């Protein structure tokens, strides 16, 4: 049976809608009273796993799900062995460097060498600062990274920014973008190679709704 890993949270409803448009109805998974983490599609020929956004590439890479939907930010950070099939176009946000609005820094290159930068996305942040040839001390936080500059644990943060409201409400300002992130359809490479047509048909059905990365 085809298994699809769907992300909890902000990407879920749009993910379910995209699969529904392609012929797989997983809408029961979004019901307010649903507590099941694995549900069959309405037609019974597929099932969905409801997992955390960061776990989607893990289930797909290890073959427990043949397809999945996940933000590009997670893909870039984890570098799992999965196939990027489609840019689904929703869930748009940007990975950005942010500092206190009162600070003198207005570009990432303005930051002093060996300063502290807090982030959930330390691999992406390290790659970015390496490209700038700017040595920094990265501090891995798992939530509320905005507190970094506020408390003084870091001079800057690297985090996802959608509307920018959270930054503004906490006296921070984004000074440089690393990359833009949207939801991506990913697949297990082995499952795609062994596909007898079912996966390809589903991807093609979704292709008109997205953009090939």
UniProtKB/Swiss-Prot annotation:
Top EC class for this record: transferase
Pathway the protein acts in: Amino-acid biosynthesis; L-histidine biosynthesis; L-histidine from 5-phospho-alpha-D-ribose 1-diphosphate: step 1/9
A cellular-component GO term for this protein: cytoplasm
One GO BP: L-histidine biosynthetic process
Catalytic activity, reaction form: 1-(5-phospho-beta-D-ribosyl)-ATP + diphosphate = 5-phospho-alpha-D-ribose 1-diphosphate + ATP
Lineage top rank: taxon: Bacteria
Keyword check for Repeat: no
Localization per Swiss-Prot or TrEMBL: Cytoplasm
Main location: cytoplasm
UniProt GO molecular function: ATP binding; ATP phosphoribosyltransferase activity
Record keyword Cytoplasm present: yes
Keywords (A to Z) from UniProt: Amino-acid biosynthesis, ATP-binding, Cytoplasm, Glycosyltransferase, Histidine biosynthesis, Nucleotide-binding, Transferase
Entry EC number(s): 2.4.2.17
Subunit structure: Heteromultimer composed of HisG and HisZ subunits.
Record text about domains: Lacks the C-terminal regulatory region which is replaced by HisZ.
Role according to the record: Catalyzes the condensation of ATP and 5-phosphoribose 1-diphosphate to form N'-(5'-phosphoribosyl)-ATP (PR-ATP). Has a crucial role in the pathway because the rate of histidine biosynthesis seems to be controlled primarily by regulation of HisG enzymatic activity.
Family of the protein in this entry: Belongs to the ATP phosphoribosyltransferase family. Short subfamily.
PANTHER family, A to Z: ATP PHOSPHORIBOSYLTRANSFERASE (PTHR21403:SF8), ATP PHOSPHORIBOSYLTRANSFERASE ATP-PRTASE (PTHR21403)
Name assigned to this protein: ATP phosphoribosyltransferase
